[in-house]
């Protein structure tokens, strides 16, 4: 199932994308998938940022080839950093580079969308908190 966020006229909403149609959902899919009865042709809506995150936690230098490419070596512990939630954009929207950025890498990244609050989760249970996945950079 492909869950997206879409804009139609002045409304923004979650939806299910099926072929060339968008099936509108009520509320957020984190609380359960509920169709509201409205459907739109894909060409009539604009796909927007796939989620409305409260925070974005990133892992840097998480594979050897990229760490070597940066000539800084791979850290012993994961390098965590945050990105502002405003950096998420929709399909075919412009990515704005911050003026202060001296180096911006572009790479294909896998985003894991956490669907509910979690703390000190055992590795064997982590999958229970994953809502879905998305493409990021």
For each predicted feature, which ranges?
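Active-site microenvironments in enzyme catalytic cores
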Residues: 1-13, 17-137
């Amino acid at each position: 199932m492909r869950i997206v966020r879409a804009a139609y006229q002045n409304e923004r909403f979650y939806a299910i994308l099926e072929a060339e149609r968008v099936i509108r959902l009520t509320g957020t899919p984190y609380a359960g998938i509920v169709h509201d009865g409205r459907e739109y042709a894909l060409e009539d809506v604009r796909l927007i940022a796939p989620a409305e995150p409260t925070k974005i936690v990133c892992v840097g230098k998480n594979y050897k080839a990229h760490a070597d490419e940066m000539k800084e070596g791979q850290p012993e512990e994961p390098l965590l950093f945050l990105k502002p939630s405003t950096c998420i954009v929709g399909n075919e929207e412009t990515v704005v580079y911050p003026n202060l950025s001296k180096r911006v890498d572009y790479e294909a990244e896998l985003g894991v969308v956490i669907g509910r609050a979690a703390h000190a989760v055992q590795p064997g249970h982590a999958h229970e908190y994953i809502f879905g996945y998305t493409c990021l950079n």
